[in-house]
């Protein structure tokens, strides 16, 4: 049995909940996981390679879990990135230790400057490159290795 970070629970998502979250949280950074519509978002949310940690402050999504790697997305209800730095690090440490990950990556729209600075300066992600013509324009790919957290 895998133990979760103490402040989280695994999110449960049915069709109605997925549609509600898609509508309610459209403005949250990273919430839509690079998906173009609610149908695509729903497929990601119920995929066996996705783990969604839910808490009172928001969500942490680990998607594309395979071969010791995953893509991580953070969505905070209050939008206060710096308030959640330690919780974000704890979730990443949990995924690396309990899920056996050695690398997590984040894909962030290039226009989200504050989110990119937070990932790099506070969490420790390293910028790897630009994904051109990603879902809605260019995106930045960042990564964090187990020994860097």
Q: Each predicted region: which residue ranges?
A:
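A conserved beta-strand-loop-helix scaffold within acyl/acetyltransferase catalytic domains
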Residues: 39-49, 58-68, 131
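Conserved acetyl-CoA-binding loop-helix of GNAT-fold acetyltransferases
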Residues: 81-97, 117
């Amino acid at each position: 049995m895998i133990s979760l970070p103490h402040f989280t629970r695994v999110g449960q998502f049915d069709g109605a909940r997925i549609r509600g979250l898609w509508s309610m949280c459209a403005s949250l950074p990273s919430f839509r996981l690079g998906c173009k519509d609610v149908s695509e978002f729903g497929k990601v949310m119920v995929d066996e390679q996705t783990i969604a940690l839910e808490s009172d402050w928001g969500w942490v999504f680990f998607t594309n879990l395979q071969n010791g790697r995953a893509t991580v997305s953070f969505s905070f209800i209050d939008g206060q990135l710096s308030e959640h730095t330690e919780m974000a690090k704890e979730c990443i440490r949990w995924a690396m230790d309990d899920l056996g990950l050695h690398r997590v990556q984040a894909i962030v729209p290039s226009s989200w400057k504050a989110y990119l600075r937070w990932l790099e300066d506070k969490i420790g992600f390293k910028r790897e490159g630009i994904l051109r013509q990603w879902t809605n324009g260019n995106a930045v790919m960042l990564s964090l290795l187990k020994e860097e957290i």
